[in-house]
Amino acid sequence: GLSTMKRREFLGGAAASGAVLTMPVFLSGCGIQQAAAVADKTPENPFMEWFGVDQATTARVMSELSANGADAADLYFQHSRTNYLTLEDGIVSSASSDIQQGVGLRVVIGEQTGYAFTEDLTLPSMLAAARTASAIASGNKAVAPQTFSALGAGDLYRTAVPWSDVGIDQKLPLMKFVEAQAKSMDEAVEKVAVYWADQDERVMIATLDGRLVTDHRPMTRVTVTVTARRGEEVQSGFSNIAAREEFGWYTEERLNTMVREAVDRTMVLFDARRPPAGEMPVILASGASGILLHEAIGHGMEADFNRKGVSIYSDMIGKKVAEPFVTVVDQATIPRERGALNYDDEGNEAGRTVLVEDGILKSYLHDTISAKQYDLQPTGSGRRESYKYAPMPRMSCTFMEDGPHTKEEIIESVDRGIICETYTNGQVQIGAGDYTFYVKNGWLVENGKVTAPIKDVNIIGNGPESLKRITMVANDARLDTGGWTCGKNGQSVPVSQGIPTVLVSKMTVGGENVG
């Protein structure tokens, strides 16, 4: 509808609709509850152990869900516990846990989707929800399975120690270490805040075609924010790291690297200036610049936007969209990545989808519904925020592959331009792909050399146009380590993104002479 065409903020605040990519500095949960500790192995009978339901109950609910007909149907059981901790000036200023449990019931008939959810996993409650969801249909009963066959557990992010077994007494010393390191790195640092989040999530998906998928999805993220003062001038910066990992992942070395980055990003701002404004070549630094790839280009490659004709790429499959050394991939199967998934939220195996190969648009990202509409196999891209939502095509780990150039060659080729390194917020219009990004850290390039740090810069452009204007791609591709969260149509999911150093031949830079 029209709402997908509206401009939407994506880093500054939440958006009701459309594409949102945030890296929140902190999130607060609410309501501390005890969750039963569950051993991290795939149980013999996942129904009984995780959700207190069995084959017969599930079959009964599926039968009710498909009673008026169904092309597809699924039950999405979810239990998650998220823990949050904040350390400010040596004091724990907040500690909370957020527990979610429920089941989402979906039936799909042609173009229509019926959806209902309940937090109550008793049979009467699930049957009532199934009747609500199936009310959109008025056909003949679909054949529902009596039993479900379990698919093997994936091993992209197996952990030995679940987060439910890790106490505050273990997390706090690490947070205090981060704070102490930040303060010791520069005497100008006067305030440090450390934000911790960890999550144990278990999902179980039963489908109309008799599949049963279980996935245990751990997640953790630590963010440090640094505020420094020189005379009257105050600057701040942050850094974070996130992964589907366990407690042991947080080594001193890894935390140190994160702190160093936050302090460096903060201190350089005291010497940074605004660059001249106008049209110029822009170098996007490796890693975090994946935000442009994800936001301004990736969303346009999600099948639902193309099916509705909203995306500029809707008639471009098989056509040239970039130079021949540009390849863009969405891959959920990168171990331990924040955006990694063994299975998507429809129970399809997650995989690797080449979106752009050697400059040619090859595929969209599909969920079950869009794949059927295009007469293709799903790409394992059906994702949802929780059991309260129906899935839709979403990205996982989205990145551009290595190219034939080097970072040095790219810098040497620029007479006058800028390098963009870190980003804080912006807007994107999904259909056209028009974007504005706010660059927090960057560098001025003059006569093929990096000359001075810059700050307070806006870059303005069009995603598909910028993709076409990438004239050099370096061989230093990397995924950003930060904890990115992507929002679309009001649903947030964790993602990863990355890119090598690339040169965009022309982009509008808002600097000195812009209001």
Stretch-by-stretch model annotation:
Residues 6-515:
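N-terminal small-residue-enriched
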